[in-house]
Amino acid sequence: MKAPAFWYAPPGTARPLLSALLTPAALAWTAATRRRLSGTRPWHAPVPVICVGNLVAGGAGKTPVVLDLLSRLRRGGLDAHALSRGHGGRLPGPLRVDPARHTAAEVGDEPLLLAAAAPAWIARDRAAGARAAADAGAGVLVLDDGFQNPGIAKDLSLLVVDGDAGFGNGRVIPAGPLREPVADGLARAQAVLLLGEDRRGTADLCRGRLPVLRGRLVPDPQAAADLEGRRVLAFAGIGRPEKLFRTLEALGADVVARLPFPDHHPFTAAELRALLDRAAALDALPVTTQKDLVRLPAELRGQVRALPVSIAWEEPDTLDRLLAPLLSGKDDHGQAQ
């Protein structure tokens, strides 16, 4: 689903009127969410659980953060596993993702990316997935999303916020992009990670309530160098496709076509062939995101370039202090105690 423009429209424009008309529905959504969160007794996993979540519908940059945390924890001696719902995949789980065997249509796109870096599991039932991962030897679990899922207790919840988008118009679905009121979410989290320039005053809103970590998404240097000056046809089916388009322009690429698709869009062979034909007609290189790449038909995937990104932390020491209690209690088998 594409986010309605009024979700991120500034005050004083005509579009917020539609948001106001949807306020009763937003109040009903909020009440239902609060009942669901308060009415469920969470299951406590036998290993620490770190949740990387957000408060808005759509993309915020969680997957690169999960990948970074998995790497940090594993470097610290913990057998860190990823756990995802497997959004967009048809298999309910719990099961461990095998990139050589599973497809995005089966397990979702994010789990395939995570499985390339660490053991990754999918499960519609997060508690069942956590049990399976712990039984398989996981020393700590990193949840990709799941902040609003009350079925499993979290030891550390990190809310990721896109600095460009912030919390949008500050209203709850369908009047705005929020999955729950900001105050409710901040009350259950331990820290906020603000990605990119703070264009919406998010840091001021969170200051005094939670630590605010800062970071930015950085393209792979070699990939960036290869794209400088190249004619590019850019396409993406992520929460905010325009982020890819702006990044490519900032790298010096000549973006001659920008093609947004719905989040988690399952590209068909016919669609991709049409994109490749259009790129050829424009004498352009087809470029997409890593998340989109794993959803492309395997037989045509090699004709598309992906732009890998990673997170650069402004104050990694603050993150290390948040993770320290998990790292300090590990046993000889990488289990956190």
Curated annotation (Swiss-Prot):
Name assigned to this protein: Tetraacyldisaccharide 4'-kinase
Pathway: Glycolipid biosynthesis; lipid IV(A) biosynthesis; lipid IV(A) from (3R)-3-hydroxytetradecanoyl-[acyl-carrier-protein] and UDP-N-acetyl-alpha-D-glucosamine: step 6/6
GO-annotated molecular function: ATP binding; tetraacyldisaccharide 4'-kinase activity
E.C. no: 2.7.1.130
Organism in which the protein naturally occurs: Rhodospirillum centenum (strain ATCC 51521 / SW)
Family to which this protein belongs: Belongs to the LpxK family.
Function per UniProt: Transfers the gamma-phosphate of ATP to the 4'-position of a tetraacyldisaccharide 1-phosphate intermediate (termed DS-1-P) to form tetraacyldisaccharide 1,4'-bis-phosphate (lipid IVA).
Residue numbers binding ATP: 56-63
